[in-house]
């Protein structure tokens, strides 16, 4: 069976120097190829919502990005503000420093505060797997499952590494068959996307969506 890669893709542009013209082009590509969503920083949500109005492509905003180290109240506020501006999905970054400090209850409360402000809006929780042990990956996946989060997500694409097959498999095994798993960071071609899907990913975050659906080789850099 042929994989419909477009339906997996969150077409993504998160660079700090991304221009409005580049964001508009991103939206045009997403509509042309019928990608699942466009994922941007929250400041560009109003532009994306306007560009995607009337299309099937969803508006996704990152929150607390890329460090995840801000105040919980700020993350919760940003999520609510992004939703008010038109975001239909939210991707938040956990506080990795708290996790590595053993402040597990605080990490969980941080996620819960954002999830509560999301209400019915699907929340994806970014683990930054390249910085975590397998035990820590399982720990966060379990708390996300307990909090009824929609997705767990591998990476920001801004740290020391992106999605790895073994991490996606571990995340899928931990959360079970129903919850979403998003592979992001360094997924730049069809072969890598297929590897992640076979490992259990139900969404792919990438700036190389056009290359993936067309079977071409993307640039070596990018999300």
From Swiss-Prot:
Keyword Glycoprotein (UniProt): no
Biological processes, Gene Ontology terms: 2-deoxyribose 1-phosphate catabolic process; carbohydrate catabolic process; deoxyribonucleotide catabolic process
Reaction equations catalysed: 2-deoxy-D-ribose 5-phosphate = D-glyceraldehyde 3-phosphate + acetaldehyde
Pathway connected to this protein: Carbohydrate degradation; 2-deoxy-D-ribose 1-phosphate degradation; D-glyceraldehyde 3-phosphate and acetaldehyde from 2-deoxy-alpha-D-ribose 1-phosphate: step 2/2
Entry-linked InterPro entries: Aldolase_TIM, DeoC, DeoC/FbaB/LacD_aldolase, DeoC_typeI
Annotated catalytic residues: 91, 153, 182
Annotated coiled-coil segments of the chain: none
GO annotations of cellular component type: cytoplasm
Top-rank taxon: Bacteria
EC number: 4.1.2.4
GO MF annotation terms: deoxyribose-phosphate aldolase activity
Subcellular location as annotated: Cytoplasm
Pfam family for this entry, one: DeoC
Keywords for this protein: Cytoplasm, Lyase, Schiff base
HAMAP family: DeoC_type1
Functional description taken from the UniProt entry: Catalyzes a reversible aldol reaction between acetaldehyde and D-glyceraldehyde 3-phosphate to generate 2-deoxy-D-ribose 5-phosphate.
Similarity comment: Belongs to the DeoC/FbaB aldolase family. DeoC type 1 subfamily.
This protein's name: Deoxyribose-phosphate aldolase
Lineage of source species: Bacteria, Pseudomonadati, Pseudomonadota, Gammaproteobacteria, Enterobacterales
């Amino acid at each position: 069976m042929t994989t419909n890669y477009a339906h997996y893709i969150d077409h993504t542009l998160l660079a700090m120097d991304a221009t409005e013209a580049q964001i508009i082009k991103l939206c045009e590509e997403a509509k042309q190829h019928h990608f699942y969503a466009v994922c941007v920083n929250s400041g560009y949500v109003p532009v994306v919502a306007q560009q995607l109005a009337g299309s099937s492509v969803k508006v996704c905003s990152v929150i607390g990005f890329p460090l995840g180290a801000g105040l919980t109240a700020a993350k919760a506020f940003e999520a609510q503000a992004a939703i008010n501006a038109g975001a239909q999905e939210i991707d938040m970054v956990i506080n990795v420093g708290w996790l590595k400090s053993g402040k597990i209850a605080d990490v969980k409360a941080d996620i819960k505060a954002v999830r509560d402000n999301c209400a019915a809006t699907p929340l994806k929780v970014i683990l930054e797997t390249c910085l975590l042990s397998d035990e820590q990956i399982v720990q966060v996946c379990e708390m996300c499952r307990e909090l009824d989060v929609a997705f767990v997500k591998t990476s920001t694409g801004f740290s020391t590494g992106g999605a790895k097959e073994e991490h996606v498999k571990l995340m899928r095994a931990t959360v079970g068959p129903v919850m979403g798993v998003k592979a992001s960071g360094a997924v730049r071609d069809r072969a890598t996307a297929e590897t992640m899907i076979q490992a259990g990913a139900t969404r792919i975050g990438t700036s190389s969506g056009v290359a993936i659906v067309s079977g071409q080789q993307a640039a070596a850099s990018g999300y």
